[in-house]
Amino acid sequence: MHAVFFDLFETLITEFENNQRKATYSIKDLGIDEKLYKKEWAARRGRRMDGSFPDHQSVLRDIVKTCGKPINESVIESIHQERIKAKSVPFKNQDSEIMNMLQTLKDQKIKIGLISNCTAEEVEGWKESIFADLFDDVVFSYKIKRAKPHSEIYLTACDHLKVSPKNSIFVGDGGSNELQGAVAVGMKAYQATWFQPSFISEEIFGFPKLQKPMQVVDLVK
């Protein structure tokens, strides 16, 4: 194998601790019922991930407008900054096994890439994180206007590292049908379960499950 590509959330970092989010933020100042907000937020997921919305603030404006509320730019900016803070928390205090695994791959001259479905504010913490220097390339969905499981995001990642899909491995928790997407372009796909409770990891079938990060190293031997 020439390269290993990783998912980000719930694969390299986790947003949860003791079954609760490590950090949260409030949207109450928008004046929208929380259940309604969550429904509208979820309805825009695809367009958030593929960059159709240029930024987080534009999503908030669209939701506020749809709900018939007045747009308050200072409130929107305040919520935006709080979301950035919350989303930066998981990039701190990384799992030592994951860091050892990545460093071992690096020492073995295996190329390391990231393929993440994300929006800009969700990965503000990446550039200052310990991961930044270990990865040869990162592909964020919002930047290339394609999200997993679309074939283009995997092929773009392979092209950046000058490797073929058949000589590449993809490791992810399985969200967004990312494992199916990786296999469809010729990659070997493995499910990372180390951050997942069993009732979630067992919902995904057909892919080898990795319980510990260092198992990734064995795949490239």
Regions found by a protein language model. Give the residues of each.
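N-terminal helical cap/lid subdomain that shapes the substrate entry/recognition surface
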Residues: 1-100, 107
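Asp-based, Mg2+/Mn2+-dependent phosphohydrolase catalytic module
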Residues: 1-4, 93, 99, 103-106, ...
